Amino acid sequence: MPVITEIEDLRRIYKRRVPKMFYDYAESGSWTEQTFRENSSDFDKLYFRQRVAVDMDNRSTRSTMIGRDVAMPVALAPVGLTGMQCADGEIKAARAAEKFGVPFTLSTMSICSIEDVAENTTAPFWFQVYTLKDDDFMQRLFDRARAAQCSAIVITVDLQVLGQRHKDLKNGLSAPPKLTPASIANMMTKVRWGLGMLGTKRRFFGNIVGHAEGVEDPSSLSTWTAQAFDPSLDWDRIRQFKKMWGGPLIIKGIIEPEDAIQALNVGADAIIVSNHGGRQLDGALSSVRALPAILDAVGDKIEVHLDSGIRSGQDALKAVAMGAKGTYIGRAFTYGLGAMGEEGVTRALEVIHKEMEISMAFCGHTDINTVDRSILHIPKGFSGDWET
């Protein structure tokens, strides 16, 4: 069994074990990948202030996210195609999150369906939805989430149109994967992955096929996907979705203060400062650089979370210190899942937790809820001094 001490250990194993198209799907951004890179590198510009001769006993990372008790302020982000990284991937990730005591967020574009995950877990999970044109299908998604006892809906608002992701286009990404000479040759080298896929019936988008109008089988999925997303989305429509759902609402994809205020005004319970992991608008601010201005705009009137770029417990701790009430990991848990299945997700969470807990103690705190900006050296102009 390999010794796992950091998320990078899992990424290296993951790269060896999954087909290239699915590795590239996770480990890439849009256009030049500037934002994808800066999501991580901007965390490196924040430095910790180490304190000594401080009692470090009885450390706790326990906190809450939208009223839910969590073992640490970290949730598993919604990641599409998770069940292509590892057979029954969403179920395995949800189980690992439940056992660890952190929220799991299921993507609409998951391979395992809402019902699949609900049948294989006991803790309520969160369900992410995109803004789609078909109101009837949206209502049925909300109804299915309610029936599965999902405790919150996460609406992604930054995918009205799809970002230009060069690697996905060149790889012909799909679920199940398109069979070309190159993809077949590559998949034949991924024996563990292939055996897992042969042993499951879940190989298509489980929330879509057989549920969306005109998508009775996988052959019609590509046509539906090309037409389903709503480019005319506005805040009134988001307000309508909140009414259709009727429960706790998290809005994901906020990167500018004006939109944070709009999310507050439509009644969201929380927002996620996110640029979709650098997979939508390349050249946008990293999430951690965008965070201070958003916090200045909304204060404590709404819970502010952050995703994009978190690859360690130190990154998550820095985000919390900057003012985020919660954080999300997507790629970090995906590496673990593709590398070692459910155990790999658990390993990823253990790594994140240990890094967060020890770093917090070095900074003079034993309770995550007391952490603030005072534990950081923040460079002048970090959040930007822009003309507009």
Report each predicted region and the residues it spans.
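Alpha/beta catalytic cores of nucleotide-metabolism and tRNA/nucleoside-modifying enzymes
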Residues: 1-44, 289-307, 311-388
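Active-site loop-helix segments enriched in His/Asp/Glu that coordinate
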Residues: 82-91, 112-124, 140-141, 145
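Alpha/beta enzyme core
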Residues: 81, 95, 120, 136-306, ...
